[in-house]
């Protein structure tokens, strides 16, 4: 059956199609948008809310849906028991339960050999059965097998050293059967069992408290790399512990930091005493299990493995009972235990304080191993586990186990893998395995006493080996994420070198540190505009990104906190080539001094009584000012490109009102040309300077094109900074203080700072922390980045510098001395920089209204007017869409502030916008050039803007 062709061509059809949209709306900032559109809830706490309506009443009622959800959370077994699919899951659960139960029997028998403590195996069996039932009811992992784990029990060796029995031979690795007729042996043995029960009880209480207090959320912050590394280290510890069964030798087992290498050395020293029969049996089991991986069985399309572990346990147990094999088994260990079963008793509460440290260590390791293993298994089957519920479940298991004077229980790594791969789908498999284990231990325990320990070691190593294969994924993990690879290596090495308990603490601490660094190390991108669109992308990603003259756009890609806010400020200052200068004490005092104190400054000492409450300390406006970085005068200059002249005659008068200008031509860029002398241009319009502008010939026009740097353009100075907060979800209180001071400092430097794409949650955070005042209002917050850019372009650009001429192509550089810079910044301290398109903000009343011109030559006219006042007869061409024969007719004007009257538009404005320099040199064109230019203008008139707003007409000054 072939799929529908329409479905196949869906992606191709829509990939080839292009969609356009045309939206007409005003430029919105946060202030006028909230005025026009009503919000559902108040954004600040100082607004009265009418709670008389029914929708605001708190409804405290319990529905059946909520009750059922709460019941299924506390008792997860109800979900799988009520919806159990017998036809699909029953056979797999039975097969997995039989495999797990048969493997658990020899593990219980040989546990005393590894844990160096002799507990009646029937007590451990009863405790394991109760633990499986409890976890089946309260646990959330479907394939988890609960039981004793040697590595967890080995952490209690320090407790056994304080309460030894049998003269401590077990701890030294020598198994000598004690004299049961000695009464002191029973006293020491019972005291040792009481200590183990106390440790297990306190461990369960700690885990139960952690689950009820919700400490399971910590697992959500532990990355997958840390979990994988910890399980790999656990697998390596398990492999090392099984060397006792593989080689048939006993060593003095060590625990704690560097114990891993001490045990390796002890095993190497004991290799001459290794049992060859045990090694051969181990290799036989490994080969059989390896071949078994090639056998594929599926039941109802669910893959399962052949239960080879069942045949190995039953086969070698039967063979060893018929044939005497010279290998290590559990028979000798069972003969050293004085009791076959001890009835449950209440643990001793008097020594809980003595085992507090060991219990806390066991609680961390056992709960972490259970949760990590559960998350790993659940990720394979695409479901989630509840970490808090698992902590409660394992805590109850250990509390119940303490009454049987058993070990601490956790997730058994090898049996969990066996239950998963043999088809176990729900906790019903664990219940089946626990029932089979208890039944066989009560009726047929001696049948398994002669089972070789090497067979059990082969089964365990074969099943935990896949967790160690994660080492092979390190190269790919390094290529994907270096931070995760670093977490993996640190977790693995700490768990190996320092042990599972201390290594766990180090791994979690390091993972939290890396996550904190990643979350607070924000990425600041400099954005530009994709031509003819409202899309803004980073300059590092796209080649056609265009810079907007006078505007810098910074995108913050993370939360802004006290950690990275200074990096944001430093990045902004670097991009706009400015440095921060700390204010002096006199300048800070001037900021905080009140007007009424000016009359009493002459008094040295004043004494008066003031019984009123002390007023709150004034807000720090800013503690530093921003200045252009020294050595980069290009940030302080305005470059204007003029036409080429053959001669220049200047008549000038020196006075204090004149401003120095340096005329730099193309000869300054090339040492082959002669240097240009400095001239003085008058700043007073009453004074004039007469310059003759001869017409350039065709030869000179062609020569102009060959001048070096003749086509270079330099952007105007920065007047607006836009911060894109569309990816910012949090701004803390300290970061808001730094941002507020940064806004004020930039305002003092005549640079306006706008925020775009600010989330409502961040806006409420700004309001709660009193971010807005008379100088910073919501008019500086824009809904989108394009709104902020349009507003920045609608503002009047900085006034262009005076014009001068030279015999060659001339570039005028406006320079100021350091004293003039400081005086200019002081004059502009109280000057505001923002004017909302729709409403005025009260904090910016000192700034005169920007002149919104209908034509696109705002700065051009002021430059032409100055040039005419100084006697400069210039003919500037802005490459605008006008008729070729249209010319600017000179006008004699006495007033410098006279505005240029708007001319009616001859044709619609073009749709394409390109941002270039404001001024270009006019070059007399030949008729051929004029005709070609006219044709390009006609072609550009074919694309018409969908709409034209009066508020954006000043933006045409950047359109060429």
Swiss-Prot record:
N-glycosylated. Residues 1-93, 139, 244-268, 375-390, 449-453, 516-960 are cytoplasmic. Its main location: membrane. Residues 807-857, 881-960 are annotated as: Disordered. One of its GO terms (molecular function) is sulfate:chloride antiporter activity. It holds the Pfam family STAS. Residues 818-827 have a biased composition (Basic and acidic residues). It is found in: Membrane. The chain crosses the membrane at residues 94-114, 118-138, 140-160, 202-222, 223-243, 269-289, 354-374, 391-411, 428-448, 454-474, 495-515. GO terms for biological process: cell differentiation; chloride transmembrane transport; chloride transport; meiotic cell cycle; spermatogenesis; sulfate transmembrane transport. Residues 541-792 form the STAS domain. Keywords: Anion exchange, Developmental protein, Differentiation, Glycoprotein, Ion transport, Meiosis, Membrane, Spermatogenesis, Transmembrane, Transmembrane helix, Transport. Interacts with RACGAP1. Interacts with CFTR; stimulates anion transport activity of CFTR. This is Testis anion transporter 1. It comes from Bos taurus.
């Amino acid at each position: 059956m072939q799929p529908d062709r329409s479905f196949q061509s869906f992606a191709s059809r829509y990939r080839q199609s292009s969609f356009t949209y045309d939206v007409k709306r005003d430029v919105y900032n946060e202030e006028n948008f909230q005025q026009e559109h009503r919000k559902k809830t108040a954004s600040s706490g100082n607004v009265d809310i009418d709670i008389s309506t029914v929708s605001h009443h708190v409804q405290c009622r319990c529905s059946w849906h909520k009750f059922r959800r709460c019941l299924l959370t506390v008792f997860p077994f109800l979900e799988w028991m009520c919806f159990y699919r017998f036809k699909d899951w029953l056979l797999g659960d039975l097969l997995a339960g039989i495999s797990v139960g048969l493997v658990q029997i020899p593990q219980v028998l040989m546990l005393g050999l590894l844990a160096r403590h002799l507990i009646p195996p029937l007590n451990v069996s009863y405790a394991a059965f109760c633990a499986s039932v409890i976890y089946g009811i309260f646990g959330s992992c479907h394939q988890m097998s609960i039981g004793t784990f040697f590595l967890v029990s080995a952490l209690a060796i320090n407790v056994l050293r304080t309460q030894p029995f049998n003269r401590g031979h077990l701890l030294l690795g020598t198994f000598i059967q004690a004299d049961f007729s000695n009464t002191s042996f029973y006293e020491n043995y019972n005291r040792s069992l009481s200590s183990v029960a106390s440790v297990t009880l306190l461990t369960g209480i700690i885990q139960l408290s952690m689950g009820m207090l919700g400490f399971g959320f910590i697992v959500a912050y532990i990355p997958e790399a840390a979990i994988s590394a910890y399980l790999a280290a656990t697998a390596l510890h398990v492999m090392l512990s099984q060397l006792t069964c593989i080689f048939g030798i006993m060593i003095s087992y060590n625990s704690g930091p560097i114990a891993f290498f001490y045990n390796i050395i002890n095993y190497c020293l004991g290799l001459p005493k290794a049992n060859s029969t045990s090694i051969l049996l181990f290799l036989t089991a490994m080969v059989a299990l390896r071949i078994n991986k090639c056998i594929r069985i599926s039941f109802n399309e669910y893959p399962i493995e052949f239960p080879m572990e069942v045949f190995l346990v039953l086969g070698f147990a039967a063979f060893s009972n018929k044939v005497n094999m010279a290998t290590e088994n559990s028979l000798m260990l069972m003969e050293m235990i004085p009791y076959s079963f001890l009835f449950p008793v209440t643990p001793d509460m008097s020594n809980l304080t003595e085992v507090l440290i060991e219990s806390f260590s066991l609680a961390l390791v056992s709960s972490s191993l259970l949760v990590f293993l559960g998350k790993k298994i659940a990720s394979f089957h695409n479901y989630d586990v509840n970490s808090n519920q698992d902590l409660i479940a394992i805590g109850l298991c250990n509390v119940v186990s303490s009454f049987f004077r058993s070990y601490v229980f956790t997730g058994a790594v090898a049996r969990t893998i066996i239950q998963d791969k043999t088809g176990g789908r729900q906790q019903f498999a664990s219940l089946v395995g626990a029932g089979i284990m208890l039944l066989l231990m009560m009726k047929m325990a001696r049948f398994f006493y002669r089972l070789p320990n090497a067979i059990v070691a082969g089964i365990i190593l074969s099943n935990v080996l896949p967790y160690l294969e994660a080492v092979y994924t390190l190269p790919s993990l390094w290529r994907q994420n270096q931070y995760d690879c670093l977490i993996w290596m640190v977790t693995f090495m700490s768990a190996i070198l320092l042990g599972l308990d201390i290594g766990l603490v180090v791994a979690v601490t390091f993972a939290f540190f890396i996550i904190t660094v990643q979350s607070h190390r924000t990425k600041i991108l400099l954005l530009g505009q994709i031509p003819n669109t409202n899309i803004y992308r980073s300059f590092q990603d796209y080649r056609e990104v265009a810079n907007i003259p006078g505007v810098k756009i910074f995108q913050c890609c993370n939360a802004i906190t006290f950690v990275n806010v200074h990096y944001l400020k430093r990045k902004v200052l670097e991009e706009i080539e400015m440095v921060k200068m700390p204010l002096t004490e006199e300048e800070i005092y001037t900021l905080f001094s009140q007007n009424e104190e000016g009359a009493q400054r002459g008094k040295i000492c004043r004494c008066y009584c003031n019984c009123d409450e002390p007023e709150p300390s004034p807000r720090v406006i800013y503690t530093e000012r921003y200045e252009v970085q020294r050595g980069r005068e290009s940030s302080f200059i305005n470059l204007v490109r003029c036409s080429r002249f053959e001669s220049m005659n200047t008549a000038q008068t020196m006075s204090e009102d004149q401003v120095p200008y340096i005329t730099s031509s193309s000869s300054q860029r090339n040492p082959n040309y002669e240097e240009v002398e400095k001239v003085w241009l008058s700043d007073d319009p009453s004074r004039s300077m007469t310059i003759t502008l001869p017409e350039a010939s065709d030869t000179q026009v062609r020569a102009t094109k060959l001048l070096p740097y003749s086509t270079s353009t330099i952007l105007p100075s920065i007047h607006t900074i836009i911060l894109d907060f569309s990816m910012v979800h949090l701004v803390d209180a300290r970061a808001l203080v730094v941002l507020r001071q940064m806004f004020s400092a930039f305002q003092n430097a005549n640079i306006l700072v706008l925020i775009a794409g600010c989330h409502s949650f961040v806006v409420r955070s700004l309001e709660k922390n009193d971010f807005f005042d008379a100088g910073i209002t919501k008019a500086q917050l824009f809904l989108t980045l394009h709104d902020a850019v349009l507003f920045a372009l609608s503002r009047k650009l900085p006034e262009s510098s005076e014009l001068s001429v030279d015999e060659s192509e001339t570039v005028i550089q406006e320079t100021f001395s350091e004293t003039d810079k400081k005086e200019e910044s002081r004059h502009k301290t109280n000057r505001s920089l923002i004017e909302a398109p729709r409403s005025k903000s009260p904090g910016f009343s000192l700034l005169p209204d920007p002149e919104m011109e209908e034509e696109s030559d705002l700065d051009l006219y002021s430059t032409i007017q100055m040039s005419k006042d100084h006697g400069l007869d210039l003919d500037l061409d802005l490459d605008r869409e006008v008729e070729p024969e249209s010319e600017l007719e000179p006008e004699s004007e006495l007033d410098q502030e006279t505005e240029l009257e708007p001319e009616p538009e001859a044709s619609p404005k073009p749709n394409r916008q390109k941002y270039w320099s404001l001024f270009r040199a006019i070059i007399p064109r030949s008729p051929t050039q004029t005709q070609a230019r006219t044709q390009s203008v006609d072609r550009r008139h074919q694309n018409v803007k969908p709409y034209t707003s009066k508020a954006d007409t000043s933006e045409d000054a950047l359109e060429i």
